[in-house]
Design a protein with these regions (language model features):
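An N-cap/entry alpha-helix motif that binds or orients negatively charged groups
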Residues: 1-67, 171, 175-203
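Conserved, mostly hydrophobic/aromatic
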Residues: 18, 75, 96, 154
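N-terminal active-site wall of soluble small-molecule enzyme domains
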Residues: 61-72, 81-93, 109-121
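Hydrophobic faces of well-ordered beta-strands that scaffold small-molecule active sites
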Residues: 73-76, 101-105, 124-128, 152
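Active-site mouth loops of central-metabolism enzymes
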Residues: 74-86, 126-135
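Alpha/beta enzyme core
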Residues: 93-94, 119, 135-203
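Short secondary-structure boundary segments
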Residues: 107-108, 156
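A structural-propensity feature for long, helix-poor, extended segments
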Residues: 113, 120-133, 140
Length: 203
């Protein structure tokens, strides 16, 4: 199938990914007002057309944090990305690398920092939640440094966990626990189950 729009990809994901993990990516906390506001803000961004100008030397390259990239965008951190598709973080990092843009690995990733580093050739960014357990956070920073991550992306809004209604309804928790309520949904996605069984990281 040829994917032309983001909606095409959303529809395909709905068919292939178990509902709990599909809804996790598309939902937010509480009334989801911030999620809606963010979407509305992106819709307001538009390109200004310029005509009758020389575009033969157009260039989207940009330096960010001392590194030259093909365009000034980055893949944002997505928690549990490896549950959308087996080795999801690795595949996303490789895709970002092929397009010449930075990838940001989430603290809540399925694939480890080391696993992503072993399967990529360019440094990636690491997202760190600012948490009360300073010793744990320090260990994560040390691992990111050892993996030669080129930037640390701080997330500061973890003081209070938001109530995610879709996750509650779907029985999704961290650490992930398989319950009878969603076993049938998993069974209905045999290809997803088969890919997960063959993934590089099953922890």
């Amino acid at each position: 199938m040829e994917y032309l729009t983001i909606d095409d990809l959303k529809n395909e994901a709905r068919k292939k990914v178990p509902k709990a993990f599909h809804d996790y990516v598309l939902s937010g906390s509480w009334t989801e007002s911030t999620l809606k506001d963010n979407s509305d803000d992106f819709k307001k961004i538009s390109f200004r057309q310029r005509v009758a100008v020389d575009i033969s030397n157009r260039n989207t390259r940009k330096s960010m944090l001392g590194t030259d990239y093909r365009m000034p965008v980055a893949l944002a951190p997505v928690g549990l990305l490896g549950m959308q598709k087996a080795d999801g973080e690795i595949l996303a990092a490789q895709a970002a690398e092929s397009f010449g843009v930075p990838f940001t690995l989430s603290t809540m990733s399925i694939c480890s920092i080391e696993e992503v580093a072993r399967n990529t050739s360019e440094p990636f960014w690491f997202q760190l939640y600012v948490m009360r357990d300073h010793a744990f956070a320090k260990r994560l920073v040390e691992r990111a440094k050892a993996a030669e991550c080129s930037a640390l992306v701080l997330t500061l809004d973890l003081q209070i966990l938001g109530q995610r209604h879709a996750d509650i309804r779907n029985g999704l928790s961290v650490p992930i626990k398989i319950k009878m309520s969603n076993v049938f949904d998993l069974i209905s996605k045999p290809n997803w189950c088969f890919e997960m069984a063959r993934s590089k990281n099953r922890t």
